[in-house]
Amino acid sequence: MTTQPRKILVTCALPYANGAIHLGHMLEHIQADIWVRFQRMRGNKIHFVCADDAHGTPIMLNADKLGITPEELIAKAKADHMRDFAGFNISFDNYHSTHSEENKQLTAEIYNKLKANGFIKSKVISQLFDPEKNMFLPDRFVKGTCPKCKAEDQYGDNCEVCASTYSPMDLINPRSAVSGTTPIVKESEHFFFDLPAFEGMLKEWTRSGSLQSEIANKMQEWFESGLQQWDISRDTPYFGFEIPGVKDKFFYVWLDAPIGYMASFKNLCNREGIDFNEFWAEGSDAELYHFIGKDIVYFHSLFWPAMLEGSGYRKPTNVFAHGYVTVDGAKMSKSRGTFIQASTYLNHIDPECLRYYYAAKLNDRIEDLDFNLEDFVQRVNTDIVNKLVNLASRNAGFIAKRFEGKLADKLEDEALFAEFTAQAEQIAAYYESREYNKAIREIMALTDKANKYIDEKAPWVIAKEEGKEAELQAVCSMGIELFRVLMSYLKPVLPKLAERAETFLQAELRWDNIHQPLLGHTLAPFKALFSRLEKKQIDAVVEETKALFAAANKAAEKTEAKPTALSTVEPIAETITIDDFAKLDMRVAKVLKCEAVPESNKLLRFELDLGDHTRQVFSSIKAAYNKPEELEGRFVIMVANLAPRKMKFGVSEGMILSAGTGGSDLFLLSADSGVTAGMQVK
């Protein structure tokens, strides 16, 4: 009985059109591409789409800063993103943009259906308004004095000092973080999606067993804390789609972004005559999978299925979330040269190396993946060059020189061949469940067996003995056959190497012909299939990344605003004695690690080296240093004998010194070169 091909639609999360693609993005796109290529090899009907996420305030503000239109900015971003994905052999059937006619129409349609079904609510809310910029100010764009503890320079929703929450309008002396002006209060009608109405459906979907256990458990926590109505509107000025029938109101970017999956597929359907409803209509028997990062699970497991349910469309079959990429055990860092852009990598290294390395470490769980640069070189060279490609090269020479490229008419070891091909379904199961690490482990175990077979048969010895031509041809043909099976298994991971192998073998590598040996088949002349990865290539990537970071920093310094005539110098504090000053023990400290406190809008957490011990210090300088990882490796000045202070997020064991008026106007104090951690400031 013939099994009907599955109908599958796969998407990746939409990269934001306000920055370059980096190796963190590539984890997800490589993971999805391997799965898609595997499904194609299995004969399934699969479509793979993505798009740029092209709306929102950051794009509007960045375009204004660059002196171009948002449309020009997102057009360049899309071209850059498509180039990078193509460079890594990501086989999208379509790559689109959320700023498209298809997305505009689908967004309006879904909104109107939700509204007609009673799932859109409206209410008038009061917001602070910047009269100079003529824009409403979200919480993070307002600063002022905490109404509870009177701490200065606090954000508009919560105080980092006393942990109080409040409305932006409760702030004392509020100011716009955009222009610095004093905001006024204005009322505005906003539109809300009634997410709580879908709680029953979402709970049932969670219990279906199709979601990753980590996602299902997290959703249960969200249910327990209570679902809230979701504000889906933003006031002008805003770069996005206007809400139908409402003046100066726009859809929040997270409403139209996931609809971009549908829009990209719609664009493909219109171009190739595919039935859109066959994949998206309620009750569709097609499979729909979203590959995403763990940071956007909330939107994809709550808002998105609820929106689809409320507008009469089908829900995803599953949402596959993955973790983040770290480099050498730490967050990616521009200053250390490890925040690697895709284009920088492609300037120096074969993309198949990264595809293989990620595959060797990826599993079906939401775990961070460490990109260890030393291990990267060793694993690629050991597995691909020394084991896999060498298996072909060490046998191809004999077949070409002694037998005019023709393979033997029968298998030298049928049992060994059967052992290799018998693993096809197990390896397929690993690919299907996204346990690529297990698939690679199994394939490499077989590769070791193949090389052991050749080592034991020693064709280089047989070649020197008279009358053993048939044996030599049989052994080397067996080695080539095993290489063919292994390359078939690795084709989803290494598509370009597979293409070169197919040229050499003069045969297509398919899953359904793995069991069919190339008996009596003629090979093409052997050419080098893969180059060894050198450490100097890694060094070049790191140095180019550092140079890009330094150039960007230099450009930013040139464009920084000069202090205005209105700037004032704080008055000198009350006089103290030398004895008072002597009580302070100030030390030079080296930043080992610096990261944002997720629950805080203001704090950075530092891990500091003081020479003979380390300390944890929290500092309210997040607004001034929005890329904290770039501070790692710097020397700072700290007050070391300040009493430890227990805060909401942990114990702070000292104070880091900085200068400025507060907020984004803060500058860390540093020491001249030559200092070491722990030195006392005198």
From Swiss-Prot:
The keyword Nucleotide-binding applies. This is Methionine--tRNA ligase. GO terms for biological process: methionyl-tRNA aminoacylation. It comes from the Bacteria. Belongs to the class-I aminoacyl-tRNA synthetase family. MetG type 1 subfamily. InterPro entries: aa-tRNA-synth_I_CS, Anticodon_Met, Met-tRNA-synth_bsu_C, Met-tRNA_ligase_1, Met-tRNA_synth, Methionyl/Leucyl_tRNA_Synth, MetRS_core, MetRS_Zn. Keywords: Aminoacyl-tRNA synthetase, ATP-binding, Cytoplasm, Ligase, Metal-binding, Nucleotide-binding, Protein biosynthesis, RNA-binding, tRNA-binding, Zinc. Residues 580-682 form the tRNA-binding domain. It is an enzyme of class 6 (ligase). PANTHER family: METHIONINE--TRNA LIGASE, METHIONINE--TRNA LIGASE, CYTOPLASMIC. Its cofactor is Zn(2+). The gene is metG. One of its GO terms (molecular function) is metal ion binding. Its main location: cytoplasm. Zn(2+) binds at C146, C149, C159, C162. Homodimer. Its EC number is 6.1.1.10. GO terms for cellular component: cytosol. Is required not only for elongation of protein synthesis but also for the initiation of all mRNA translation through initiator tRNA(fMet) aminoacylation. ATP binds at K334. It is found in: Cytoplasm. It catalyses: tRNA(Met) + L-methionine + ATP = L-methionyl-tRNA(Met) + AMP + diphosphate. A motif ('KMSKS' region) lies at residues 331-335. The lineage of its organism: Bacteria, Pseudomonadati, Pseudomonadota, Gammaproteobacteria, Pasteurellales.
